[in-house]
Amino acid sequence: MNRANLLKLSARLGAALAFAANMTLGCHAQDLPTLPDYVPHEHVSGTIRSSGNDQMAGLMKRWERAFMKYQPDVRFVDTLKGTASGIYGLEMRTADIALMGRAMNPFERYGTYERSWTYPVEIEVATGSAYMPRKSPAFAIFVHRDNPLSKLTLKQLDGIFGAERGGGWKALSWDEDAARPSGQNIRTWGALGLKGDWIDKPINVYGPPSQGAGAVPFFRARVLNGGAMWNEDLREYADRGRMMADLARDPYGIAYAALSYGNEQVKPLALAETDAGPMVSVDKANVANRSYPLARPVYVVYTIDDDRSEIADPRVDPKVREFLRFILSRQGQEAVAQEGSYLPLPLKVVQEQIRKLDSKETPPEKLLLGE
C-alpha cells in the first residue's frame, strides 16, 4: 500500500473511531433516576456461576463488584466463552445463569428441558449497542445514497426480504397467523412508491447467510414474523464489509447490518412498526428508548427445575433472584451506562422484567409439552 492510500485509510479509521466514541460517550439516562433502588429482599450467600457471552464480561464484572457491596457473602465464577456456551452451562448444571447476546431459539429451549429437566427464563438486562459491533448492535436498513427512499415499515421490510410462508415461530409455538401469500412480496422499487426510472427497477436484496446464527434469528423474528422463507434472490454474505462494499456500487440494493458497517455511499432508513408510524431513525437515543424497531436486547437466562426432577427445587435460586433484582435496579443500570458498550433499559422494560422474575405462571415449555 502506497503512502497516499495509507494516509487515506488512517484518516477513515480515525473518523470511524471518533464517530464510535461519540456514539458511546455518556448514556441515555433520562429513565435512570426513576428506576427502583436496589433494596435487598434477603441476605444471600454462596457462589453464582455464569457462562455465556464473552462480550458481556466487562459489564458482568461491574455488576459483580457493585452487587457485592450489598451482598458481601456472594462470590462469582465466570466462564464466558460465547453465547452458545451459556446454554450448555445451564443444561449441564455447571452454571446458574447464562449471559446471552441474543434470545434463545425454540430448539435451545426444548433442548434445555429435554437434557436437564429445567425451564429456562429469559430476563432482559440491557439494550444492545446503537453502534458498536459485537455488542448486540441494532440493525440498520441500508440503501444506496442516491436512492430517494427515506423510510419503511416492518411490513414492507417483510415484503422485501421475505417470501410466501405458512406461518412462523412465536417463542415455542408455530403460529399460522404469521402466514402470508406471495402476493405480499415486494420486488420492485415502484412497489414502494418510487417514480420515474425507479418504477420497474428490481430490489436487489443483500444480507448475512439466511440460516446464520446469532443476529439472523432476531431479524427473522422481528421482520419475517418468525418465518424462515427468504426472498428467493437474497444475496448472502458471510463478510459484512464486502456486502456493504457491493451495496455501495448498487443503486438498486438494500441490506441489513449494524450501523458500524455503513460507508459514504449508503444511508440508513427510518423505520416504523406499523403503517400508522411513527417513523424512527436509528440513533443512540432511539435505540436506548426502544422506539427504534430493530433495537436488540441482551439477556440473563436462569432455569427453574421441573417439579418431577430428582434434584428439584422449583423456586428461583435466592442468590440469583437477588442478583437479577440488582441488575434491574437503578444501581444495576447505572453500571450498564458506565460500562459504555451497552445501553440501560427504559423504565417500562425494567418493570416488565421484574414482573417476569416474580411470576408464578407455569413455564410455556411445560404447557406445550403437555406436562
Locate the predicted segments by residue.
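N-terminal secretory signal peptides that target proteins for export/translocation
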Residues: 1-8
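Bacterial N-terminal signal peptides
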Residues: 10-24
